[in-house]
């Protein structure tokens, strides 16, 4: 079985985890559709990092 690792940002900085999104994402995701949640997460992350565009993209990985 292939293990996927994902980089997520949280209050401690960059974290490598086996979950597609970090804690921040699931906090925001609560009560939104997945697409809305990802859009909100990207926007929040963009502002947190202080950039115009994120230097990476989000995609779902299926085994």
Predicted regions and their residues:
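Intrinsically disordered, low-complexity serine/threonine-rich segments
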Residues: 11, 20-24, 59-61
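Short intrinsically disordered, low-complexity segments
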Residues: 15, 22, 41-43
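Short, flexible N-terminal segments of the mature chain
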Residues: 18-36
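A short, charged, amphipathic alpha-helix used as a generic interaction element across diverse proteins
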Residues: 30-53
């Amino acid at each position: 079985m292939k293990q996927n690792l994902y980089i997520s940002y949280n209050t401690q900085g960059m974290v490598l985890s086996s979950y597609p999104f970090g804690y921040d994402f699931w906090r925001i995701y609560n009560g939104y559709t997945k697409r809305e949640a990802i859009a909100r997460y990207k926007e929040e992350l963009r502002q947190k990092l202080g950039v115009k565009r994120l230097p990476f993209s989000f995609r779902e990985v299926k085994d």
